């Protein structure tokens, strides 16, 4: 279990990164979930119509119980219900999620649809995924499997606040293989992961250069990693500068969360009272 000090610091860091990435609190309501007790109340109410079987079949739950057998708790099992409460408490129609969250969003639609059917109403909308590009994004990790994320460990992910030196060190340690032995050989997952990240942060010319080198069996993974690290550093530079600027302004950060919580409680309170 994380210690409270770490949780508070993580919350602050996420807020700073959101603001640094360009989210404008004048247009978007930012708040801490624990500042909105109505979420916990709606979570409890939705749990009354959530079934054990469907929760146990959730892919994320099955993955978690494989990796943390010593801490399989009810919160882990019912996490999709909490996520649903987070979404539908404000009657969201569209949700910006990555590809790995598609199942949770489908479960949110299930809970919303079930509530509407049981109580003979069209109260909750059935939210759909909102994507900023042509397809839902899933940035893979540097360890060769899974997605890039904080829960998978520090070495698996590049964080927005990481220094250029740290980014370079992480990318250069990324998992690969011995290299292709046949022309146009299919890439193993660990190598494809690096190409997927390259596609997200580099130019098309850069991607094509390394694709061609791989297909011709002339690729040097060291060169690929150096280029990838350089492009990640350039891609994240504006955000990294803003993080440094914003993180020291504690008064501003508290103001953003206080005003966000007030707006969220007004919206969430209305939903819970009507439910």
Where are these regions (language model features)?
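Internal, conserved structured core segments that host functional sites
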Residues: 66-115, 119, 140
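N-terminal Rossmann-like or analogous alpha/beta NTP/dinucleotide-binding catalytic cores
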Residues: 1-85, 240, 244
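Active-site oxyanion-binding pockets that recognize sulfate/phosphate
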Residues: 1, 91, 98, 218, ...
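Non-membrane alpha-helical structural segments and their capping/turn regions in soluble enzymes
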Residues: 5-8, 12, 102-105, 254
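Short helix-capping/linker segments at secondary-structure and domain boundaries
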Residues: 50-56, 89-96, 202-210
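A short secondary-structure junction signal
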Residues: 57-58, 92-93, 120, 153
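Conserved nucleotide- and phosphate/pyrophosphate-binding catalytic cores
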Residues: 103, 109-275
């Amino acid at each position: 279990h994380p210690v409270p000090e770490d949780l508070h610091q993580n919350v602050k860091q996420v807020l700073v990164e959101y603001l640094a990435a360009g989210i404008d609190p004048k247009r978007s309501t930012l708040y801490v979930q624990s500042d909105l007790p109505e979420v916990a109340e709606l979570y409890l109410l939705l749990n009354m119509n959530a079934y054990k079987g469907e929760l146990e079949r959730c892919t994320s739950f099955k993955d978690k119980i494989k990796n943390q057998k010593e801490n399989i708790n009810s919160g882990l099992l019912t996490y999709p219900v909490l996520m649903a409460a987070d979404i539908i408490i404000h009657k969201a129609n569209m949700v910006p999620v990555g590809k790995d969250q598609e199942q949770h969003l489908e479960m949110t639609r299930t809970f919303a649809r079930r509530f509407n059917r049981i109580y003979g109403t069209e109260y909750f909308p059935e939210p759909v995924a909102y994507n900023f590009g042509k397809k839902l994004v899933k940035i893979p990790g540097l360890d060769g499997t899974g997605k890039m994320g904080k829960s998978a460990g520090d070495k698996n992910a590049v964080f927005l606040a990481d220094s250029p030196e740290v980014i370079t060190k992480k990318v250069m340690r990324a998992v690969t293989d011995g290299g292709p032995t046949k022309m146009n050989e299919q890439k193993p997952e660990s190598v494809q992961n690096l190409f997927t990240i390259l596609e997200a942060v580099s130019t098309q010319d850069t991607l094509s250069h390394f694709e061609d080198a791989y297909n011709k069996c002339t690729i040097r993974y060291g060169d690929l990693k150096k280029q990838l690290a350089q492009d990640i550093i350039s891609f994240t530079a504006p955000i990294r500068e803003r993080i440094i600027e914003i993180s020291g302004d504690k008064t501003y950060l508290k103001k953003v969360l206080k005003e966000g919580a007030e707006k969220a409680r007004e919206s969430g309170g209305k939903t819970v009272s009507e439910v």
